[in-house]
């Protein structure tokens, strides 16, 4: 019986010839990741073990991105605690305000993650790195602490669902529309503890940023991980994002012809339309064409680990160029990293945003989790390029969050209601 791409990576890191769905294994780790919320708990668990040093000073990665720049005393203390630990242990890949970015945009940009890696992160959207052909998944702070000490983690080998992507998507249809469509089809538990394995001729039409977005939201379908095959675009990205702090070996895995999948879906990308997830679950999807009444919005958030990359900002700038944000609408744009921010400045995107009436912020996860910088009041509605729209996710429990692509978010910012780009371009 053959193995899926995910299973092959796990078998290699567990030093086994093969693994099977449901098998418990212990695997070597290439990266252990934490942020300013999860690292303090992991550090305390690490300290309980009585071990002097982390297993590898380059493979333990800490990014202060959630409540930064610090929003209050408690968040400042969390960051201080993490900063002190990283310094005392000589953690090389520690990213603080000024050079940090949103972690799941930053790590690929820095070349810290690559094809064939096994990565755990104390953040549920660690599944993002599957876009590079890696196995990456979110864990709790306890497993992060143990991983920092041992360089190993236990896993139950997941089953898999194959998604065969066909044909070329139309203009304005992005990775966000694709993954929202899929989640709408299978539900928020449709891939529970399974790997979402993407393949098909449609993959070649997807940019790396599209693939990052799709894998980022695999967890919103309950998946253990999402993963794409390694192709020329993947290798071009990897070769142009070399890690300066450690040597990374690229290992390419392909699913066996006789790999077993629990389900197989075919998605015709050419038939997809701009898709929005309505409150209060990512599965509550409709195309913009299916919205039968105006939904006026109070706030637009563009950015996050889902859609804070340069291609996302390029689309937003194209739509906003020469236009003004609708009266009464607050628009906040968060470049995913300092590098993305600087590139957006150099290309004139930031000027376009500010002239349109948007606020532009340093990289932060703040508004996505209702932490700071864009909290919603009771009764307010926001359209957002983030990844979750649960009750109270971005503020008051009586607020509403609609998830959409950067293109739909930008168009909505101009019209003041949920709209698609063709309505204004």
UniProtKB/Swiss-Prot annotation:
* The protein's assembly and partners: Heterodimer of LeuC and LeuD.
NCBIfam families listed in its UniProt record? hacA_fam, IPMI_arch, LEU2, PRK00402.1
Keywords for the protein's UniProt record, in alphabetical order: 4Fe-4S, Amino-acid biosynthesis, Branched-chain amino acid biosynthesis, Iron, Iron-sulfur, Leucine biosynthesis, Lyase, Metal-binding
Q: Which organism is it from?
A: Clostridioides difficile (strain 630) (Peptoclostridium difficile)
Please identify the protein, giving its name as recorded. 3-isopropylmalate dehydratase large subunit
Q: Which GO terms describe its biological process?
A: L-leucine biosynthetic process
Taken from the record, one Pfam family name reads Aconitase
Q: Which HAMAP family match?
A: LeuC_type2 (MF_01027)
| Residues where [4Fe-4S] cluster binds | 305, 365, 368
From the UniProt record, report the name of the gene that encodes this protein. Answer: leuC
